């Protein structure tokens, strides 16, 4: 109601919601979501989680709209084919993840040729937990993120740092980067979301409090033209800003994610799809927290010992490899 939305697509329709949404055109079937996009549509926010919206985002990139992208999994799965498709059809993808939204605005300020990009991670709930305790991490512990309030899946991804590994891959595809041009560091205060390092030795950074209203509002307004309700950042409230290298023994998903990025092709999709499955098993108590990344690596080796890695996969290639994973997933006892 606040933004006078005319059409709305939802994945699950609940009776109580229907009563509230009578004045809107509501679409509940994902396959019909494209009905919300007509000539009068200016901006589409794509917030379907995981790979459920893979077909839809492929269609949306063909219709020349501005897309606020709150789904990294689809970008990672289709890779540069998606960004090329958007560019070909004059669609604009604006990432809504705080890190990639920061990069988007920093690069649009056009300070000249850049050398590399750094995104930050808070370190999640286990930044200081002894490594010997990782086998005993409970679901409740893993869901307790120190900074962000999120759903279960993304909270687990943040705890394992799979989320950051996926964001590294996403940045490569969104901004057409070489593998050597993107990395991540730990920044516990989560005030700096990304930094762009230029060839002249200058580094620019975007700082704001961790609040998703900031990247979302920037989708609808010029970056400095909208005053939202986020409290102004006062650096004097912080005694220090910390930065640490990522320990891959603590966060093996970062190392695995970088290896997957270098391999390319179907590997990033397989890494992501395996993670979705393995996180669901952890939430059900079937596997341990430390198994999430370990089993991902084991299954990746199995997948590409049995299947050819297609370097420029289309939607059918992705669906086929995901079906193979469903049938042949390895879970150790």
Language model: regions and residue ranges:
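Catalytic, metal-anchored helix/loop core of enzyme active sites in primary metabolism
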Residues: 1-333
């Amino acid at each position: 109601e606040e933004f006078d939305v005319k059409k709305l697509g939802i994945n699950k329709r609940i009776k109580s919601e229907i009563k509230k949404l009578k004045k809107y055109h509501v679409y509940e079937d994902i396959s019909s979501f494209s009905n919300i996009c007509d000539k009068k549509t200016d901006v589409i926010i794509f917030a379907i989680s995981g790979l459920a919206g893979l077909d839809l985002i492929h269609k949306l990139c063909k219709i020349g709209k501005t897309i606020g992208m709150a789904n990294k999994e689809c970008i990672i799965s289709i890779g540069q084919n998606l960004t090329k498709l958007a560019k070909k059809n004059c669609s604009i993808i604006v990432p809504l993840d705080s890190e990639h939204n920061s990069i988007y605005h920093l690069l649009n300020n056009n300070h000249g040729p850049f050398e590399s990009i750094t995104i930050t991670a808070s370190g999640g709930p286990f930044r200081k937990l002894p490594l010997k305790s990782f086998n005993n991490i409970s679901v409740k512990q893993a869901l307790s993120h120190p900074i962000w309030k999120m759903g279960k899946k993304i909270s687990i991804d943040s705890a394992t740092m799979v989320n950051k590994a996926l964001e590294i891959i996403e940045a490569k595809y969104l901004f057409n980067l070489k593998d050597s041009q993107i990395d991540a560091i730990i920044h516990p205060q989560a005030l700096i979301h990304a930094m762009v390092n230029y060839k002249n030795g200058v580094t620019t950074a975007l700082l704001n409090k961790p609040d998703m209203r900031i990247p979302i509002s920037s989708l609808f307004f010029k970056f400095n033209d909208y005053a939202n309700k986020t409290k102004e950042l006062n650096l004097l409230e912080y005694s220090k800003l910390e930065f640490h290298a990522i320990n891959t023994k603590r966060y093996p998903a970062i190392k695995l994610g970088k290896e997957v990025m270098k391999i390319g092709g179907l590997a990033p999709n397989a890494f992501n799809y395996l993670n979705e499955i393995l996180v669901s098993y952890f939430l059900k108590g079937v596997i341990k927290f430390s198994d999430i990344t370990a089993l991902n690596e084991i299954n990746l080796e199995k997948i590409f010992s049995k299947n050819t890695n297609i370097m420029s996969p289309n939607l059918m290639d992705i669906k086929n490899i995901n079906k193979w994973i469903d049938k042949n997933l390895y879970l150790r006892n």
